[in-house]
């Protein structure tokens, strides 16, 4: 066996960058079909390898995770997220993860059900049968308000929600695949760079306002007992971070980085997962009818305890995230020279772990492009290769907000499903890649009476 993995031939100077930037999803699918488990790509100055076998995913994310760190893909990511939990490494990451853990304890997450349902019902009060809503936009607004309440311990008004949403678009555009970014520095006074810098500054202002609102209150005073889960002190993330700052464990920059990470990562992925779920249910009337019957059987507004009575809703959400994973590929960097599937992977190489490819592969799923929620039924679970599904990552660095995101998504689905019928009235999906996978167009949903 050659020690160099196979891969597609690139263009002079641009390598595979132009093909990838035109349609990353079609490109990843095509090269996976053509070249197998380990694929060499030419996407920039670093050696890049795409891994499409779940067993290699398990190695990189779980069994040998310490040998594969988070890469610095773009200085703009540092400008946006800094040294927050998503991007930090080593002792810094361990410190921040340990600090944040109480905010994501299962008991605390379950106690957020009233806030999730309350915000959802507030949103529904502005909807009427016959309305045609952009479901992606509406869900993004809703999940911004929910994440601020859940993790910042406060609420924000409609104007602040609008400000956040308006400034997410230039951020998303900045991270869309573009081979020319390799030669255009972030400090260059291009229109895109200026819009990105302005958006970051505006969002940092929103964060600073939220912090100022809470700073110095009784809830953020230092607790001599520390931030244990059973502490009488508030366990929202902002309170925890402010108490840590009072103890000298966090700087102002640390605080901002963590809160920016949570504001952006904590709402976008959930809103997108729900957008694709409503879209898929609209395309499959039988599944929608089963979903509606299940949520109608609840005795009143859904609670965290009710989720165990919503097995089909859980399957629907899992299947939506399989077909349309909001995070469509993970990136890691090899910290050492190593071998994967017999191929040499040099230190410093960039590794792509594409959920988009693995989730949709006929190697791991029967009829992989079909929407089949019952593939997640217990009697079929053993059919699946374990790491053929990883919408939240896996291993020690899996998404810390996974359980909250799932609770939030299922409660929103149940609340909306009990209130309205819905039908998608838009065009065929045109997907765009950025930090997340999002539709490149509005997602109109027509509401009707149940």
Predicted features by range, described:
Residues 269-282, 412:
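Short, small-residue alpha-helix embedded
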Residues 69-74, 92, 108-272:
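Cytochrome P450 heme-thiolate monooxygenase catalytic core
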Residues 353-380:
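Conserved cytochrome P450 K-helix/beta-meander segment immediately N-terminal to the heme-binding cysteine loop
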Residues 1-95, 111-122, 142, 154-158, ...:
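N-terminal membrane-proximal hinge/A-helix region immediately C-terminal to the signal-anchor transmembrane segment
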């Amino acid at each position: 066996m050659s020690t160099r993995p196979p891969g597609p031939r690139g263009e002079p100077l641009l390598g595979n960058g132009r093909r990838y930037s035109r349609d990353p999803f079609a490109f990843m699918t095509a090269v996976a079909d053509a070249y197998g488990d380990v694929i060499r790509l030419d996407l920039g100055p670093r050696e890049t390898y795409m891994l499409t076998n779940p067993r290699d995913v398990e190695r990189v994310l779980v069994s040998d995770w310490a040998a594969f760190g988070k890469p610095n893909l773009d200085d703009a990511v540092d400008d946006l997220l800094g040294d927050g939990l998503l991007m930090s490494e080593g002792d810094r990451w361990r410190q921040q993860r340990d600090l944040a853990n109480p905010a994501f304890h299962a008991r605390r997450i379950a106690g957020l059900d009233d806030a999730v349902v309350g915000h959802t019902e507030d949103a529904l009060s502005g909807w009427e049968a016959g309305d045609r809503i952009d479901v992606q936009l509406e869900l993004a607004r809703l999940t911004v308000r929910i994440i601020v309440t859940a993790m910042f311990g406060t609420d924000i008004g409609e104007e602040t929600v609008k400000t956040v949403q308006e400034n997410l678009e230039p951020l998303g555009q900045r991270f869309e695949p573009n081979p020319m970014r390799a030669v255009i520095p972030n400090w260059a006074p291009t229109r895109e760079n200026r819009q990105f810098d302005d958006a970051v500054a505006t969002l940092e202002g929103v964060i600073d306002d939220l912090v100022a609102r809470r700073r110095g209150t009784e809830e953020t005073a230092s607790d001599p007992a520390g931030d244990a889960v059973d502490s009488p002190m508030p366990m929202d993330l902002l309170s925890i971070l402010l108490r840590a700052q009072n103890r000298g464990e966090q700087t102002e920059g640390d605080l901002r980085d963590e809160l920016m990470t949570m504001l952006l990562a904590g709402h976008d992925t959930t809103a997108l997962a729900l957008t694709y779920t409503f879209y898929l249910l609209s395309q499959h009337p039988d599944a929608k009818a089963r979903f509606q019957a299940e949520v109608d059987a609840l005795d009143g507004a859904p609670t965290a305890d009710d989720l165990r009575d919503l097995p089909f809703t859980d399957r629907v959400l899992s299947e939506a995230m399989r077909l349309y994973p909001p995070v469509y590929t993970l990136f890691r960097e090899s910290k050492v020279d190593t071998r994967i599937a017999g191929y040499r992977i040099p230190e410093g190489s960039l590794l792509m772990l594409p959920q988009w490819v693995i989730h949709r592969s006929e190697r791991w799923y029967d009829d992989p492009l079909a929407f089949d929620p019952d593939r997640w039924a217990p009697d079929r679970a053993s059919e699946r290769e374990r790491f053929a599904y990883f919408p939240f990552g896996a291993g020690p660095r899996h998404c810390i907000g996974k359980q909250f995101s799932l609770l939030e998504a299922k409660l929103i689905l149940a609340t909306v499903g009990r209130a309205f019928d819905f039908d998608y009235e838009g065009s065929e999906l045109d997907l765009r890649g950025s930090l997340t996978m999002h539709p490149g167009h509005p997602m109109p949903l027509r509401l009707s009476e149940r």
